[in-house]
Amino acid sequence: GVVTLDTKLSEILPSYKNSNKKNVTLKSMLSHYARLRPWEPFYAHTLDSITKLPSEKYYRTIRSEKFDIEVTNNLFLRSDYQDTIQKIIKDSELLPSLKYRYSDFPYYILKKFIEKHYDNTLDNLVQDHFYQSLGANNTLYNPYHKISNKKIIPTEIDDYYRHQEVHGFVHDMGAAMQNGVGGHAGVFSNANDVAKIMQMFLQKGFYGGKRYFKPETLDKFNTCYFCDKGNRRGIGFDKPQLGEEGPTCGCISLNSFGHSGFTGTYAWADPEEEIVYVFLANRTYPNAGENLLLKENIRTEIQRLIYEAIID
């Protein structure tokens, strides 16, 4: 059948038919307005209760058929743990009240649906349908095995889960537990490639002589459906703030869209001024605790200076 933004979870994933999320629509879920919990530390369930190190019940240091998910260098998770992650999400409690709360869950759920629907993995799908023909040749999941680590910025010195320098593997623990391929995390890139992808969005699905999707698709995703409820989000995309605080300098068109990332990334496209702004940092290195990048508004201050320079 046809999937629209009003399609409910139970209509695309039969396992959700008896879930408290059965009536959640794609629109509300991707606008982060569906009472879904922000995240779940799945990795914590796999640590030894005494040593707090990865438990032998779940991990091995050598790959085998049963332990096939590489979460970092020489550490392999049980292959069947993917099902456990999906079950934890499906059975999770809803938040007590309906309000805007960013959640990673929609991207776990929809990754499962997309891979099932296309009978292919997400990393293959985006490579074949987008990155390759966009000429985004440095954009990929799991670069560790594909390009030299000298070209990859290290992510974090992890002292709570993987207990090593995470380098060439995704920072997000939940994505690492999905073999590095998350719907919400895991893509490595450089500023030039991200700019190509954002330019394709800016041109409503058209880039380099090729149409990737219809202009009206971008328009539907770049719409704030719950602005009247105080939720600024588009579908997947973040949008400029409605009040004081938010993801942009506050000096930018409401038609603009983009996203920021936990590890220090930021990409924003403004159709009015035809500007794409990309900022990439590894702010989680050496550790993720101190978020000076956010506290000092560095990404949005640079954005403000760009706009001041144009307007002047």
Language model segments and positions:
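Glycine-centered, phosphate/nucleic-acid-interacting loop/turn motifs that mediate DNA/RNA or nucleotide
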Residues: 1
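Short, glycine/proline-biased beta-turn/loop segments that scaffold the active-site neighborhood
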Residues: 4-19, 132-133
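A short, well-structured edge-of-sheet supersecondary motif
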Residues: 5, 72-78, 139, 267-270, ...
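Short, conserved catalytic-motif segment at the N-terminal edge
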Residues: 18, 165, 172, 288-289, ...
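Short, surface-exposed loop or secondary-structure junction motifs
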Residues: 21-254
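Structured C-terminal helix/loop/strand segments within mature extracytoplasmic catalytic/sensor domains
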Residues: 259-312
